[in-house]
Amino acid sequence: MQLGMSSTKMKSLLKGLRYISQVFAIEGEKEEEMQIGNPTDVKHVAHIGWDGPSDNATAPSWMNDFKSSPVMESIQGLGEDDSSVKCQSEFGGRTRDLPKLPKSTRKSSSEKGSPTKERSDKTKRRTSNKGTSSSRRTKDEDSTSSSRRTTKDEDSSLSQHSAGLPEVPKKSKRKKSKEAGNGGSSRSSRISEADYMSDTGSDRSMPQFEDDRNGF
């Protein structure tokens, strides 16, 4: 019984190993079928007949008709020109083909891209605004102080000028009026006396005028 059990176990193990080996063998055969020659020799179907006259023997007949058409020849010429242009651009024409941007656009693009520069610009503007406001305040204060000083200097100069001038004595109008009245009465008395003397022809004076003279 024991021998029968062991033989069945061995058979089952061998069957499993055979199955695994067959699976690996089938996968290996499939890989060998897919690999046709070296990887560098594998060509795409669209490239058939494009590599030169050596492949004309293997190329189909419809490819020859397609090659002989004038449209295909023009396309080939354009392809050669494009390849030459590409080679030039790859080796030496990259920097020449690029348009030169002006400095202002470069600066603006760099400033927009960096947030730190924007913050620094804002702080600079704030400081400049503060500086201008403080300078304006100082200018206003200086102008007001200078105007006050000029007014004070003018007041002091006026006071000194007035102190240096001598005081003019004030004359009473009453005295002038009295003196004017006395002078007028004496003149009138003289005129009347002269008229009296001319009329009478005598040197005597009028009694009224004598009384007036005695009174004065």
Swiss-Prot record:
One of its GO terms (cellular component) is nucleus. The keyword rRNA-binding does not apply. Pfam families: PBD. This is CRIB domain-containing protein RIC7. The keyword Membrane applies. Expressed in roots, leaves, guard cells, stems, flowers, siliques and pollen. Interacts with ARAC4/ROP2 and ARAC11/ROP1. PANTHER family: CRIB DOMAIN-CONTAINING PROTEIN RIC6-RELATED (PTHR46325:SF9), CRIB DOMAIN-CONTAINING PROTEIN RIC8 (PTHR46325). Residues 36-49 form the CRIB domain.
